[in-house]
């Protein structure tokens, strides 16, 4: 409770000091409910003119996570949006997916909803060449990058990639770089490392993942938002395995596959 009080006071004090023109809130009230204790007091103070007037904008991704009490949750979201917010920015392309497709109460939102397109970093020029030189991989050789996001549920696809790589007849020309994610179980990590053969490097994490995709001839990954945006940004040919229990990954990957941006792997493909 003390930490919450301090956070709430810090945010409120910041607003009093800076008097911003725009208050951009990520996901809330669609999600991040755990932070309402510090966000709501600011929203109320702006609404009641106890803080300087500013535009309050909600920033939200393309696909919303399903809620158990969906109808009640969406009603609360709409009430908060219409009362405190001036607009919603959806980081998506409406040709691919619209907010209304994962938010049933969309038509009850009375404030403007605008689509920004997907937000993704672009790799620096020649970054792919830099990575290939760093890995000592020639222009005629093939680099495959396999990844599993945070790693919590990524063992099956990484194990499958290693098995498939071991069967390639052109291994001398093909290189595999595996990023397991920091949260992959240690036993799974040790097993992957032990099974890695020639031209295979297994590591948990890189701060330069976008550059590796820019250098790659093929990406094999799960279908999380950030990885998918990296795939689109670099244009690397991609095989994507959406996590079976995640509607968001399945829906996004399926729509992108229909547009030819990637190919979807099913469980049986593993």
Which ranges hold each PLM region?
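An anion/phosphate-binding loop that grips the pyrophosphate of nucleotide cofactors and donors
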Residues: 18, 85, 216
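Donor-nucleotide binding loops and adjacent catalytic segments primarily
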Residues: 93, 103, 118-218, 250, ...
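Structural alpha-helical scaffold elements that stabilize or flank donor/cofactor-binding regions
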Residues: 14-16, 77-81, 211-212
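Glycine/threonine-rich flexible loop motifs
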Residues: 31-38, 154-157, 230
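A donor-sugar binding/catalytic signature common to diverse glycosyltransferases
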Residues: 207-251
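Conserved nucleotide-sugar donor-binding subdomain of glycosyltransferases
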Residues: 1-36, 65-66
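Active-site-proximal region of nucleotide-activated glycan assembly enzymes
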Residues: 37-115, 120
């Amino acid at each position: 409770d003390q930490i919450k009080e301090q956070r709430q006071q810090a945010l409120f004090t910041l607003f009093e000091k800076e008097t911003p023109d725009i208050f951009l809130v990520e996901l809330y009230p669609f999600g991040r409910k755990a932070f309402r204790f510090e966000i709501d007091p600011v929203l109320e103070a702006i609404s009641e003119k106890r803080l300087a007037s500013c535009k309050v904008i909600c920033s939200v991704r393309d696909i919303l996570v399903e809620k158990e009490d969906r109808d009640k949750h969406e009603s609360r979201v709409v009430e908060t949006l219409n009362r405190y917010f001036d607009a919603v920015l959806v980081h998506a392309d409406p040709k691919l997916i619209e907010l209304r497709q994962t938010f049933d109460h969309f038509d009850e939102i009375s404030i403007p909803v605008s689509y920004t397109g997907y937000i993704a970093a672009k790799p620096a020029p020649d970054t792919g060449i830099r990575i290939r030189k760093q890995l000592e991989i020639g222009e005629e050789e093939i680099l495959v990058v396999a990844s599993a996001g945070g790693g919590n549920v990524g063992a099956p696809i990484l194990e499958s990639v290693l098995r498939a790589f071991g069967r390639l007849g052109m291994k001398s020309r093909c290189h595999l770089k595996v990023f397991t994610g920091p949260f992959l179980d240690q036993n799974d990590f040790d097993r992957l490392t032990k099974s890695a053969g020639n031209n295979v490097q297994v590591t948990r994490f890189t701060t330069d993942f976008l550059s590796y995709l820019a250098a790659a001839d093929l990406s094999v990954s799960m279908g999380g938002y950030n990885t998918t945006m990296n795939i689109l940004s670099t244009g690397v040919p991609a095989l994507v395995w959406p996590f079976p229990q995640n509607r968001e990954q399945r829906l996004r990957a399926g729509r992108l596959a229909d547009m030819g941006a990637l190919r979807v792997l099913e469980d049986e493909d593993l």
